[in-house]
Amino acid sequence: MNALVKTICTFVTSSIGRKIIVALTGLCLVLFLAGHLAGNLLIFGGPEWINTYAHGPHSMPEAALWGIRAGLGVIFIIHVWLTIQLKLENNAAREPYVFKNTIKATLSSRYMIYTGLTVLVFLVYHLYQYTLRVGYDPAQFTTFISDGTVETFDVYKMIVAGFSNVWCSAFYILAVLMLFSHLRHGVQSIFQTVGVDSRKIRPLYNFVAIAYGAIICLGFISVPVSVLLGIIK
């Protein structure tokens, strides 16, 4: 084993190294969420906007599309796996508190792993419903874009059909609220892990974390709420 490989192995197995990897993979996912939200909000522009956006990735070569999906999947799995590892190690090393009120951690940080696992369960369901499109017959969800010249799957109709189910919308909204709690602590942790942490700047990045989480989550929630209220139909 050469020195470089040994250094890499030492880094990825150390507590600090894994925290940095969690922060970097978390940053990738945070940025992905922003892009995903921007695409989702195109539904307010009407069927043409959202269907054109959704058709874009599917116009790519199949191998390239699944390569991107696989890359995101690997980033997500690494993030979840290392987070659980660090949480379990931290719990094992920490002595139990005699009094609960001595715990100074925020609710977001204390329940980080649970909100994350809730989001994971939701993600599996979300992929099953909207990426694999299980239960949606392509023959009934076909439309045309680009002035009727390109045939594509009707994502607009699929979203309206899905969120017209109150229970589906309720589960989505609950998961997004869990995501807010997760993002609030996660974004704060990214700043801390990369060394941007001082008493002067801490209130600023705490505000950024809360604001970012709120914008992302309110944006996602606006879609099912608008469907249920008949704004999107």
Residue ranges and their predicted role:
Residues 1-233:
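Membrane-embedded alpha-helical bundles that constitute the cytochrome b-like, heme-associated redox core
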